Structure formats: C-alpha cells, structure tokens
Amino acid sequence: MGFFFKSWGKYKYIPKKLEVDIISRQGLGAWCVLLWIILSTLAPIRNIKYEFFVVQHVISYVGFTTIVMIHVPKDMKVWVWAPVGIYLTDRVVRTLYLVYNNISLFHKRKAGAAAGLISCRATFTALPDRATLVSIPNPTFKWKPGQHVFLHCPSIVPLQSHPFTIATLPSDNKLEFVIRAHRGGTRRLFRHANESLPPVASKAVLVDGPYGRMRPLEQFDTVVLIAGSTGATFTMPLLRDLVRRSCEGKLATRKVRFVWVVKSKGQVGWFAKELRGAVEAVAGLQDGLVVEASVYITCDTTLTVESDGGSDASSISSVGASIEKPALCGGDRCCCTDTVLEGEKEGGSTSPTSSPAPRNTCTCGMPIATAENEVVTSIQAELSLPESVNIKTGRPALRALINRELEQARGEAAVAVCGPAGLKGVVRREVTGLCDERAVCKGSGADGVYLHVEGFGW
C-alpha cells in the first residue's frame, strides 16, 4: 500500500484515485484492517483484556477476509478460499472432537459417573492464596503427563475457554486443575469456589483436548524439574509418572531433581500430598530412582526475622539470604537479596557452608518466626511432608543447581521448567550458558542436555 501511495503522491493523485477507483478503496480498507490485526496482537495491547482481544481478533479476521474477497478478481478468489477452508476445517474438527469427548452417548458409562448428556462435571474448591481446585471425575479420554486442555464452564464463565495443565495422571481416574485467580475467568472461578457451601454441587463443563507434546523423560539419566507457583501442575505429573515407572521397573532414569518455587507456605499445600507420595514411594526402592525435592518459599511473612537495628537484621534462610529494612522493600514488603543453594558455591561445587552468589532472591521483612529449623519442622509437620523434602527460604541459585546435576549425570540430562516468564528466562539463559561452557555442541563428548520450557498463557 505504501508503494501505491508513494507513486500516486508524486502527482497529488491520492484523493482523486480513492474517489473514482472502488478497487483502491477496497484495498485500502483491507490494508487498514490488516494493520489493526497486527497492532492488536502486540503484547501490551493484547494483555489489557485478553477476552476482548480474542473476540475482536476473530471479527477482524472475518472482516479482512470478506474485504479481500470483494477486492480481488474472480480468477484469484481461489487463493482467498484456501485459508478460509483451512480455518473452517480446523473449527469443524475441533468441534467434532469436543462433542465426542463431552457427550456421554459416545462413551460407556463408568461406575459412579453422573447421569446426563454432558459426560464431564466438575467441582470447584477454594485453595489457599486465591487458587481454585477444579476436579472432574471419570474423564472419557486418556492423556500424558504434562499435557493441557481447554476448559469451558458455561454456567460460570460463558463464551470462554482457557488452557490449563492437567495436574493428575490417567491412573488417578480424574482430571484436576489448580488455577490461580488473576482476573476475568479465573477470578470468577475462584469466587464461585469461595462462595460455594458444602456439599459442593458439580457443574457441567466442556473439555477440549488433550494437547501438548514433549520428549519422554524416561529416556534421560537425570531429569531436573523446575516450577514456579502453579507451574507445578506441569512438573508434578512428570515426577509422579517417573516414580510410577521406577516402581514398575520400567525406568532408565537414575535421578530426578524437583525444584518448586512458591511465594508462601500456603501454596505448598496445593501439591503436598502428591509430593509426599512420590518421595515416600521411592524411599523403599533398592538401587532405584533417586528423588531430591526442594521447595523454596520466597515471600512468606511468617518465615523471616527482622531486628530493630538495620545492621543487626537477621534471616532464617538456610541459603544465606539477608533481610533489608522495611523501608527498602516494595509495596508487598518483599526484599531482594543474594543467596545460593545450601552446601553449594557459585561454581556448583559442594561445601559444608553456604556462600553468597550473585543471584537475586526475594525474601520478606515481617518478623514472626525466630528459628529456621523450627519453622521448617512446623511446615513439614503441618503439611505431612517427609524430612527429605528440603524447605528453604529465598530463591534457588539455578545456575549452581543445574550445573551440579549436569556434572553428576552419567548420561543425557533433561531440564523441564514451567512458571512465570522471569523463571523461564533465567532457566533458558543458565542452561544455554552451561551448555556452552561444557561444549556440548562442540564435539567434546559431553552428554547432551534437553530443555523443555512450558509457559502460562497462550
């Protein structure tokens, strides 16, 4: 369009051309709609109101295609129908798949399944820290650990479907999702769960999926699973699946390093039962899978100590985090300090004492607890977690942690991460840097590293 405008502008012909030439007006209209489609997909605009973005994006696509159909000559319309056919085929296949998964007429009724035309009915339970547990018993399909579905609940969030990772295994015979409330649909789900009184009535839901694929982790010698907040819905099923395979004697993986970063101890309860079961299942195995699990609590006000004097401030963190004055903290009274893993230095070597490393760590400055060991013990007792699950304050030194596992691996290693954008970016950067240092791709003979990054959103 710029080429035409530049050519017409030399002769001041643009207004006259648009006035007398309907084809030019149609082309300009299509170009304007296409420009809006591109601009509206930019993250700052898209994230203002995602539900509105989806609706206007579909409407804009239909409008753009219609204008182009009118604009092009008759013998060129086939090139417009081609993408329309692809889009409609996708919609038809997805609709048929959705109907098959959710209509009970296509499936044999399982014992305990609710009667009705819709085969999937969900209960909603409020969890600590504004999270919602969505549970769907007796699903009609199978899935693999780490896969996700699009969940649609017309009675609570009409005309919307959102992607959520399945937090259970097929052997559990139920679908479960842990959904953190933000805004829009997730906030309405939490409000419904929080306001519901027992016994909780189930709601009809539609499930579209499962989707997602990754390399089987059981083919690696060492697996590092890193999650932030509800990212554990991705890593926990992977951990449980590896443990299950190990108990059945069908696993080549030697070690799993499980790291979960949360803001408060209330979030640990989301998967405390599953984590306890996985750790206890491998505890009795002879020469079986080794699971090393750590939970890092970054911003819980009950887990830090602060004295009146700035220089005398102390921390209960087992990883060497220090507490700053409240005046230096953010609005949520969350301070950033430096920390490393317990027993590890920056380079990844082990040491009986902790040594600070240049890694930003978030801890809090509101004093309640007075001794770290007492706090950790109380958390483990409260959540019935075994002592082998390390509870730490502050953020992990991911470079040292990952490097240690790669150095100790006896074969190829895999790193899988799911969480906020910041966590994913750090893991990407650290794994890439370590691979360069180890010269994995430069013919040194070092074993390869597989990295899988799973993110929130679309």
Where would I find each of the regions flagged by the language model?
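Classical protein tyrosine phosphatase
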Residues: 1, 86, 228-259
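Membrane-embedded alpha-helical bundles of multi-pass integral membrane proteins
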Residues: 1-96, 100-101
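Structured alpha-helical bundle/scaffold domains in large eukaryotic membrane-trafficking regulators
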Residues: 47-51, 100-108, 247, 435, ...
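Reductase modules of NAD(P)H-dependent flavoproteins
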Residues: 62, 177, 182-186, 191, ...
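Cytosolic juxtamembrane regulatory segments of multi-pass membrane proteins
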Residues: 65-72, 112-139
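Membrane-interfacial segments at transmembrane helix termini in multi-pass membrane proteins
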Residues: 85-124, 204
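FAD-binding FR-type
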Residues: 135-224, 240, 373-380, 434-458
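Hydrophobic, well-ordered secondary-structure elements that form the walls
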Residues: 166, 209, 235, 258, ...
